[in-house]
Amino acid sequence: MTVLAVVLSGCSGADDGDESQSSREKSTNPGSSAFEPPRLETKATIGNVEGRIAAERRSRVKRDVTEIVDAWLDAAYVAGDFPRTDFDDAFPGFSSGARDDARSDAGLMSNQAIGDRVESVQATKRRLRIDVLATGKKAVGVTARFVLLMDLELDSGSDAERSERVAGSLFMTWRQGGWQVFGYDVKRGLA
């Protein structure tokens, strides 16, 4: 598995228009008690591809990997009710070993360290570049390089409003019928 990680680190929604009137009113009326800013969509691209893979499969890899990364970013940083202290489900799509590591790094890999002080979180940038390792015309590994910028409003103190940047790489492989994060290299700090 170490060899795969080294190789990978070297790699560089549909809208059907059937939205109900009440849901449109909630999403567009700031006076509504159910108002939430629209979710910022992740801008994802395929980066370097080592090996051969058909365009159709590239599109599928892009879609599937973006879903895994989005699920983690939402669960760990930007979605859910705040303030909160429960981040048990913050690592969807992670292997059991990577999930254990991420829980040990919870202040880096989620908002757990400040979750009880967070009043609101708004993502201002979500970017993803997916480098692919393919063999036999199939993607077998990816390095998902991401950037998340978010504005946080905390309950009090000199840092009550601040912008943070979380960026790095998630190393993924195809396991049990889907992409799974087996390792990461992530940094977090003020934006």
Language model region names:
Residues 14-29, 42-43, 95-103, 144, ...:
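Short, charge-rich amphipathic segments
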Residues 110-134:
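A short, amphipathic edge element
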Residues 8-10, 64, 88-91, 167-169:
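A general secondary-structure boundary signal
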Residues 2-71, 77:
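Juxtamembrane and targeting peptides
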Residues 133-191:
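Exposed beta-sheet edge and beta->alpha loop/turn motif
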Residues 44-117:
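Core segments of small alpha/beta cavity-forming domains
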Residues 11-17, 123-125, 160, 179-181:
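Structured catalytic/translocation cores of nucleotide/phosphate-coupled proteins
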